[in-house]
Amino acid sequence: MEQTVLVPPGPDSFNFFTRESLAAIERRIAEEKAKNPKPDKKDDDENGPKPNSDLEAGKNLPFIYGDIPPEMVSEPLEDLDPYYINKKTFIVLNKGKAIFRFSATSALYILTPFNPLRKIAIKILVHSLFSMLIMCTILTNCVFMTMSNPPDWTKNVEYTFTGIYTFESLIKIIARGFCLEDFTFLRDPWNWLDFTVITFAYVTEFVDLGNVSALRTFRVLRALKTISVIPGLKTIVGALIQSVKKLSDVMILTVFCLSVFALIGLQLFMGNLRNKCVQWPPTNASLEEHSIEKNITMDYNGTLVNETVFEFDWKSYIQDSRYHYFLEGVLDALLCGNSSDAGQCPEGYMCVKAGRNPNYGYTSFDTFSWAFLSLFRLMTQDFWENLYQLTLRAAGKTYMIFFVLVIFLGSFYLINLILAVVAMAYEEQNQATLEEAEQKEAEFQQMLEQLKKQQEAAQQAAATTASEHSREPSAAGRLSDSSSEASKLSSKSAKERRNRRKKRKQKEQSGGEEKDDDEFHKSESEDSIRRKGFRFSIEGNRLTYEKRYSSPHQSLLSIRGSLFSPRRNSRTSLFSFRGRAKDVGSENDFADDEHSTFEDNESRRDSLFVPRRHGERRNSNLSQTSRSSRMLAVFPANGKMHSTVDCNGVVSLVGGPSVPTSPVGQLLPEVIIDKPATDDNGTTTETEMRKRRSSSFHVSMDFLEDPSQRQRAMSIASILTNTVEELEESRQKCPPCWYKFSNIFLIWDCSPYWLKVKHIVNLVVMDPFVDLAITICIVLNTLFMAMEHYPMTEHFNHVLTVGNLVFTGIFTAEMFLKIIAMDPYYYFQEGWNIFDGFIVTLSLVELGLANVEGLSVLRSFRLLRVFKLAKSWPTLNMLIKIIGNSVGALGNLTLVLAIIVFIFAVVGMQLFGKSYKDCVCKIATDCKLPRWHMNDFFHSFLIVFRVLCGEWIETMWDCMEVAGQAMCLTVFMMVMVIGNLVVLNLFLALLLSSFSADNLAATDDDNEMNNLQIAVDRMHKGIAYVKRKIYEFIQQSFVKKQKILDEIKPLDDLNNRKDNCISNHTTEIGKDLDCLKDVNGTTSGIGTGSSVEKYIIDESDYMSFINNPSLTVTVPIAVGESDFENLNTEDFSSESDLEESKEKLNESSSSSEGSTVDIGAPAEEQPVIEPEETLEPEACFTEGCVQRFKCCQISVEEGRGKQWWNLRRTCFRIVEHNWFETFIVFMILLSSGALAFEDIYIDQRKTIKTMLEYADKVFTYIFILEMLLKWVAYGYQTYFTNAWCWLDFLIVDVSLVSLTANALGYSELGAIKSLRTLRALRPLRALSRFEGMRVVVNALLGAIPSIMNVLLVCLIFWLIFSIMGVNLFAGKFYHCVNTTTGDIFEISEVNNHSDCLKLIERNETARWKNVKVNFDNVGFGYLSLLQVATFKGWMDIMYAAVDSRNVELQPKYEESLYMYLYFVIFIIFGSFFTLNLFIGVIIDNFNQQKKKFGGQDIFMTEEQKKYYNAMKKLGSKKPQKPIPRPGNKFQGMVFDFVTRQVFDISIMILICLNMVTMMVETDDQSDYVTSILSRINLVFIVLFTGECVLKLISLRHYYFTIGWNIFDFVVVILSIVGMFLAELIEKYFVSPTLFRVIRLARIGRILRLIKGAKGIRTLLFALMMSLPALFNIGLLLFLVMFIYAIFGMSNFAYVKREVGIDDMFNFETFGNSMICLFQITTSAGWDGLLAPILNSKPPDCDPNKVNPGSSVKGDCGNPSVGIFFFVSYIIISFLVVVNMYIAVILENFSVATEESAEPLSEDDFEMFYEVWEKFDPDATQFMEFEKLSQFAAALEPPLNLPQPNKLQLIAMDLPMVSGDRIHCLDILFAFTKRVLGESGEMDALRIQMEERFMASNPSKVSYQPITTTLKRKQEEVSAVIIQRAYRRHLLKRTVKQASFTYNKNKLKGGANLLVKEDMLIDRINENSITEKTDLTMSTAACPPSYDRVTKPIVEKHEQEGKDEKAKGK
């Protein structure tokens, strides 16, 4: 580490960059070159030094370097980074300490670094004003660009701008050089942007290029320069670019899916959208214009006559739009279709294909490109209801299926995949920055340590001489490090630290070592490293606001606050050292919370920090605070005693000498949990301080009696005081004079009388009841504001005004009293108080300006009072925090978004503005600019904003009509993809990430909450007291009632004892042990006095044990990890006590950490109670009933009781039988189905009606019977404790009541009718019967509390906008309409209400009416906001708002244009934030639920989980028998040809080509094209048939064993049949070309063969994995739709047909209702369906209209029912169910990506088996050893082993069975081990795979391996050695013999013998060689004994196998 700091950091580390420095660098470079002449590039990159990331150009200088000497600012200095030691660079630092790095070579070949010109340029460049100037220029330039038609003088301004930019570039080029070296001008990509902008400016100026406006738009790119100037933006842009890269796979998949769907659409709907209703041609001859003149010369009775005949021209007639049928107010003619379920034409019209397509001809499926556009529109769900309605009208309702598929698979899946990918890219980016930061931190820490050690050593030498303190300095040293180090943490960094902590926790759990022991963890924000002044922040809840304390001396607390940060299970607080030694409880989670500054236990034994007992695990909060606060409470700081205040309330824990209980005799702390007697801003009141001082200080003094203790304490104290003083100085933000000023003027404590007054006021204002009262006032005030409406009576208005004055008074009084009680200085130290002050001031200002016109907006500031609720409402607090947190992170993103919006708005204005003006008549009938145009900047901005909201198609049609298709498509698509899909998804990703579970931890313990809770507690206590008194009174007056007395006694007792406990805050253990009761009143710890102290709990938690956040005893982290370990079993007197306390702990621990629920666990936490599978029914009644009414107790042993019991048992058996259940399910389905028939035609179908009536009775009787049976069988107790049974019960009741009413003849009563509609709930009973749905519903029920919570918060949030809307728009939406034409009168004709009334008096056609959805009261305001937030129907509301003038005035076109901004702001906060918050909460909640269910997917049943797991690991495949190669030579050749990969791929290419030819088809193609296409198609059919035939020849009957082949076969047959019978099929079925589209499915197969397609495979795999869960959610959605459809039919069947309700889309029949509801599932078009239902009285509708064929009168709707119906449906389907869908996809996507990231994927295993099949054709699962080498080489990477691989294979030590065979699993394991390396996971995988393999292959004979390859090799080698030895021995013997013979026959032919001997030796050698080769080749080289053992076994198995085969045949 020391090496990275080249120079010791500090001010002396800077040196001027001089010629000598340059020479030195050159010398070093030369030396290096001499050392290695050819540097190895690669090597260098890998292992060489890296540039120090802290010293990068553009970053600020780390503050470890101290201040820069002023003479060195803006001067060239030597580079500080050791990496650049031999590179020609130097750095320059400006005043802000920013680092600029320059190349030391000559710029432009002439300017050396020492050239005065270059020096000046550098000075200018690094000056902060320079970038400011550029920034201002850019902004001014942007303002000029927004001018739509700029005046002439702006030309000169343009030149000025160009000049400034040129100047900037020149300065940069002179200072940096142009492009050759590093750090020159063009090396920075952002400068390329400048360069191009400037070049274009000059080019357009001097060269005439024709279309200048297009080029002028390039100037817009200058806005992008802001990005390069603002540092934070670059990172966000980086993230954006990353996510776009990541999106490539999704984009490919999306385009592919859309193409497939577009092809299907093309085939299905080609030309359909041109079907129009055309008038029947009249018979008279007046239609001359449509007739063709023909001159006919004919022979008439022999005389030639010339006659002119008129013939009718059909074609031109049908094209004439005058004869088409138009609905009023619609631009396009009415569509129709010729199929029975399509739209019909009115009388006198016929359906003909004529004219152009709808929407200027842009909406159609006529060619592939238009179809693709339509599908893209469907996918982004923009105005798709229109496309849906048009298509269904033209083609028929059955085609709804097509839309269902596209919406669910295309839209939901693909769009959310984009979200998932963007979110993951963001997450990765985050991870990277976190890791980098962590690394930096470690380095930085080491530097600090070094510096500090020196300083400390010096200090310590002076301070103490005693050897006994040798250990302290290090501790103190660390403390002071922290003091100078802990910069203020931003909330973001706190979050980052939390994330890091999580990561580290995971690492440690997975067996990490304690390597980051005393690593000091600190915020990552770059600037925090370089802050000069350090301030400590108490990091209480996730948000870090600073708190100041009641006296300047309390800085101690601030150390405590940050050092011992009170976060729960804080893994690393700001500052954490782990006791490195033999830490007793080191395996626990809080090991590094030991803030002990002592290194090992021995030293802790008698230290100030009282060590804890072995294995005792405390809640982390306790462990931290106990230690820390004891350390601080022991010595008075500056003579005053202060207890520690942390944000969890005040915990003052003091060590006292308690009885040594543990064998070791360690001291145990006594723990007292004090209630936070703190006022709002955390200051401790005087009285409390006094009390606490007296109560706790003496204990610690006793503790310190021991001299050694005292001495040690004092030494620590001194060191701490030093630290503290340093801290104090460093914490002060302002110059000291300000502190003096504030001490004198802002702290009022001069006169003692005043102090008394202050004290009294303090007691009053700080009382919890006052808080409660204020909260109630806030709620009341909000109600008062929400009561405003239009029209209001004078009196009501007066009441509201007075109310407002009263509330303003109350809040003002509160503020002033608080200021008196707290002093202004401390009052304004707290966020909430500043907020209060701000609001009060505004209210007072508003009262003053009440009568000023146009300032009514100030009234809306009152609404901010609502936010005061956040103090006492955790969820709201959390929401505001999340918005706060994300605004930080989103700030940059919002800027980027703003820049993008700006750029596109300007581009649009420049490119299309003129066209809108010129061609306006094309898009507007009156030739006036429409509302949405691009002629000026504001409107252009609105269009871009609208596109971001997802509405692009309508504005794009207009644009395409006026400005040409290509340009408009390009611009709009870019905005859509860049802005909407990427940036907005990044927005969502950020929101979701700030939503991570820890943020939701039911808001962190906030002392603010306590006040309310204390107040509520007191009320509870008061009530309990009154009850007790009443009981006592009763007891005295009626002595007889002894029983009551007995019941009350324990309660009474408990209360008395509690009072004792309360009175004495410092509970001494001996005396008050009996106070220690847990909530049930059982004493929990009399046994030993050991861990009792922890449970001394005071007042309020008796009542609110769980929901009192100030009590930090009970916050285990999750249900799975409660504090059982805390409770040492010996502490409990009995088993039962232990159990009980465990239960208590469990209850408290599930105080639902991660959810937004505040109290208790979610309702449906327990799985649904199923009746036990015993055949004995349970008791009928509850215990209570039996005790009260003795008659319920029946003996079942004899007589009637026995008969009754037998009856119950019989019933129980019946009910438990599967058939019974099946029958009931069948009945439920039938009765639900029956409801679907009750549509408007039921009265005309008499027989069906009668049948239904009888059926209804039958069903009711059956269900009643079922209910009775269950009552008898299960007993009331079981029946009525099951939620599902209650559901059944209520639904049966409804049927029963309506049945009785019918029998009594009351069926026409209104109440009974509405009850009948409740029968629609019948299908709900199916829920409990279908497991799949029940699972989803349980998950949903679990989420309901948090969903409701968020819903409430959203409502509060929206309330503010709603009240504001009422303030702005109430009564202003009224307008005067001409009832005949429906047009609004001009202002010139009608100016106000009275004018309109005059018109009405004169003639009847005018009417003064309101917009249906308006802001006249808060309720309607909510409805309007919902329409705006879902972007449906928002246009009408916005138009009305923008046109409004004032109450009772006629609106004028775009009168108050800037009202658009109200909606823009609402959309950003109300829609983007709150609706996405919904998604966040739901996803978060399901993850919570998932954890609870043990990480399993909660949307799946057991069966589906099995499927899911099978999908997850396909590794369970066994080697299959390949299709045997046919013996016939010709067949064999074909077989080889067909089975090659090339053949497959070529077929795929053919399929794609076939698709292309299908894409070429259009609706209006000529006959010539049609014939060519049909021929091409014929060729394809021949080719595919050929493929089919070839495969049939080669694969024989095996062809049909493969699914894909059957699929191909069917398609081919269909194509052939289709070719011959095309006409017939066209007529009766869908067009046969569709079957060709299905072939595309085969492309899925090819993905496996393409290496690059891995990403796409992952995406498809994620889809496959999501299917089971998505199916369940789909089922639930269907059920909801079904119920709502039936409800809709019974309520809205006869509504007037207008707006969205017409002859096809209505609630008249079940089918139509379903079609409507499907469309609303995505919230599309619900405003249109709601509008007619809001008609409640004439003249909007006619209540007496007769509906033919029905007894119902009138066509009015029921507004309240309608609003409830639609709003509830949207919340259920759109917000909840659809978001569940998203949650599943996100989840599975992350799982799938994790899977694909593993080194070995399923595909690799599959490839292994595919290759295996070739080597093991009989699927024996074994392979001979000699084949193995080839096999290993044949595999594909990563498993393959290229030859030569014999040695590697031998080294793998593979087990072999007889016959030298190796099992496939063993090989697979060995190979995977090679890829993954040795690890524990490997063994787990092995076991898993073996189990799976055994399961899938019961046939695997468990051959015992006899040997292994390694053993075999060793045996072979040994054999060779033995043989050699033996041969040598032989040889020796022979030689001996030979020599003996030789000696004998010495004289006879000696020479001859020598030759013989040579030959002999040669022969022996030869022999051994052949044997050697033999050995390696031989396979039977194992000793005979082995063979003998295994042969019979093997033979036996082989024989068995043959027998089995024979049997099989």
Swiss-Prot record:
Present in cerebellar Purkinje neurons (at protein level). Expressed by myelinated, non-C-fiber neurons in sensory ganglia. IV repeats lie at residues 1523-1821. GO terms for molecular function: voltage-gated monoatomic ion channel activity involved in regulation of presynaptic membrane potential; voltage-gated sodium channel activity. It holds the Pfam family Ion_trans. It is a multi-pass membrane protein. Residues 1619-1636 are annotated as: S3b-S4 loop of repeat IV. The keyword Heme does not apply. Residues 28-48, 507-528, 593-607, 1988-2009 have a biased composition (Basic and acidic residues). It is found in: Cell membrane. II repeats lie at residues 750-1022. Residues 456-466, 479-492 have a biased composition (Low complexity). Residues 495-506 have a biased composition (Basic residues). Residues 28-60, 455-528, 584-627, 1129-1163, 1984-2009 are annotated as: Disordered. I repeats lie at residues 110-454. Residues 370-384, 939-952, 1416-1433, 1712-1726 dip into the membrane without crossing it. The chain crosses the membrane at residues 129-146, 153-177, 189-205, 214-235, 246-269, 398-423, 769-787, 798-820, 831-849, 855-874, 892-912, 966-992, 1219-1237, 1251-1276, 1279-1304, 1314-1332, 1346-1369, 1458-1483, 1542-1560, 1572-1593, 1602-1623, 1637-1655, 1666-1688, 1760-1788. It comes from the Eukaryota. Disulfide bonds join 277-345, 336-351, 921-927, 959-968, 1376-1396, 1741-1756. The keyword Repeat applies. Residues 1-128, 178-188, 236-245, 424-768, 821-830, 875-891, 993-1218, 1277-1278, 1333-1345, 1484-1541, 1594-1601, 1656-1665, 1789-2009 are cytoplasmic. One of its GO terms (cellular component) is voltage-gated sodium channel complex. The modification Phosphoserine is found at residues 470, 523, 525, 550-551, 607, 730, 1516. The Nav1.1 voltage-gated sodium channel consists of an ion-conducting alpha subunit SCN1A which is functional on its own regulated by one or more beta-1 (SCN1B), beta-2 (SCN2B), beta-3 (SCN3B) and beta-4 (SCN4B) subunits. SCN1B and SCN3B are non-covalently associated with SCN1A. SCN2B and SCN4B are disulfide-linked to SCN1A. SCN1B regulates both the expression at the plasma membrane and the voltage dependence of Nav1.1 inactivation. SCN3B and SCN4B reduce Nav1.1 conductance. Probably interacts with TMEM233; modulates the gating properties of NaV1.1. PANTHER family: SODIUM CHANNEL PROTEIN TYPE 1 SUBUNIT ALPHA, VOLTAGE-GATED CATION CHANNEL CALCIUM AND SODIUM. Belongs to the sodium channel (TC 1.A.1.10) family. Nav1.1/SCN1A subfamily. This is Sodium channel protein type 1 subunit alpha.
